[in-house]
Amino acid sequence: MRELAPDTILSVRDLRTWFKTKRLTAKAVDGVTFDLKRGQTLAVVGESGSGKSVTSLSIIGLLSRPGAIESGEVLFRDSHGQVHDLAKTSQRGFRKLRGREIAMIFQEPMTSLNPLYTVGDQIGEMIALHENIGRGETRKRALEMLGHVEIPDAANRLDDYPHQMSGGMRQRVMIAMALACNPSLLIADEPTTALDVTIQAQILDLLRRLQAQFGMSILFITHNLGVVAEIAHEVVVMYAGRVVEQAPVIPLFQKQKHPYTEGLLACTPNAERDLDPDGERKALYSIPGSVPPITALPPGCAFEPRCRYAISACTTIPPQLESAGANRLARCLRSAEI
């Protein structure tokens, strides 16, 4: 097992997660590599089908069959300094890590919370699973967590059921459950997608404050670059199961080194950019085409059929993830020209 840098909490190297059947193999994640530093937020961005959620499920050991890690290394440093290769960890090993060292929140809290149990019981169950404390202390800790996630009148909401809360409140409960045992790593899989813009901003602000308070690292999965600008330190852009660009957040927004990243940003509404010279509203830009099936990727660059910079070499030569400037990587034959 290789050594981790002192400030690195998660290091993924050449991760391949494939879904195999008798007829075909779907390479949902194909050679993904990135590092997440302690106390920072790494955003993984891409359209539906890019492989970002499968990457997160591979890390936390929640893949469904026939999905399986084919190869690669996922090194995680726990709160005691011990390094685990999550790609080789058994489900028994994951049960010790999930909740205590690594936690996850999902896109739709209503389907993640049990409708038959109160929110206090569900937060308390997470605490009782990992800590040897009595029921009274467990309930006290659950109440403290509701306070941390800023649920008003927490003492009276502790015995509420999920259906008695709004979508934003339920997501706060999910965050309280995830952070109940003070994990080192929080994986957030599109936690604001199902919320309206106002509540979305409140949840992002809450995550930033809790990160400063608890000192956790966050792996943030999203398709929304506006959210990335609010919360991330580093950005990984995925397309068709591969990383196509990686950079610190500010340089990425200032200048993109891959056409797909450029296209994603161009799709984001902008009040000034979306006006023509006469002041009329222009049609919102969209990237032409769609993500190719991962079972039938083109032989060259996977983005070539949709790319306005494509040349003949792009149809036959698979680009490699290479340096594109200081602390930047891009998978494009023409990244130096973009």
Language-model regions: role of each:
Residues R2-T8, V83, A155-N156, Q246-I338:
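Short catalytic/signature loops enriched in Gly
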Residues E47, G61, I187-P191, L195-D278:
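P-loop NTP-binding/switch modules centered on Walker-like glycine-rich loops
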Residues H80-A103, L129, P251-Q256, P292-P298:
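ABC ATPase NBD coupling module
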Residues E137-N156, L265-A266:
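Conserved ABC ATPase "signature" region
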Residues D160-M165, M169:
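Conserved ABC ATPase signature
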Residues A180-S184:
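A short, proline-enriched helix->beta-strand linker immediately N-terminal to the Walker B motif
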